[in-house]
Amino acid sequence: MEHPNVLVFVEFPDPTVPTTGFLKGFKYPDAEVVGFYHLDEGESAETVRDAHGSEFDSELEAIAERFEQEGVRAEYDLVFGQDRFAARRQIIERDAVDAVLLPGASNTLGKVLVATRNVGNAERKASLLDIVDQDELLAIDLVHVADPDDPEGESSGEGILKQTASTLVDVGFPELRIDRTVRTGSDVAFELSQAARGYDLMVLGETERDLGDRIFGPIGEYILDERDVPVLILR
């Protein structure tokens, strides 16, 4: 993945901004910083833009400059709407985004936790090394959540993690820095949020629940809300 395009999605009026220490761990991506403002029923984008547009644009420019200072090319845009999931999906499809970053409070990018659901996305997880600077990483741990009703769930999960770890090693990541854990639980979002304690970044593969499910709520945003850990969703 050469110069992957990362959508950095922040919400106004109080956006969470990636810290300088966190950004130092990124390696050669292009960033698209999008600020989203939720319109209440009856509220118009024109009214909000007239009242706060210049203020929000200045904040977005400052965020983009923070990326630029760390060697990450960045553009920015401000969008309005009543559905942030639909807005995010539209941008992802329009701009062929490779990954989505939901910023959190991490000040470094040394410990990364990668959630792995199946063997099929192992190579996509390995593409993490094209976004995160390997030299900054202290550990890249893998986690799989097994179905408690599946008698072979844990053993299957161990196999998935082993193959994912092998893929990471094949692309140059030191095997000694990789740890593997299988958790068992019916609530995947809860199990992953528990596993994310103490990490600087949580990496997920794309699912409808991460990018737009309004019924159960996106897993990525649940983890961010519970742990304030940044989440990177790989497509």
Which residues are covered by each model-predicted region?
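Small/aliphatic-rich secondary-structure junction motif
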Residues: M1-T47, K111-S155, S166-P174, I178, ...
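A short, acidic, amphipathic alpha-helical segment used as a generic capping/interface helix at domain edges
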Residues: T164-T167, T184-A196
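Charged helix-capping and loop-helix junction motifs
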Residues: G53, E158-K162, F216-G220
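Gly/Ser-rich helix-loop-strand patches that form or flank binding pockets
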Residues: G81-D133, A196-R235
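Short, ordered loop/turn segments at secondary-structure junctions
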Residues: Y37-E41, V79-G81, G104-S106, H144-P148, ...
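N-terminal positively charged helical leader segments and presequences
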Residues: D40-S58, A64-Q69
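Short beta->alpha junction loops
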Residues: D77-Q82, D179-S186
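Helix-enriched interaction subdomains in cytosolic or periplasmic regions
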Residues: M1-N5, S58-P103
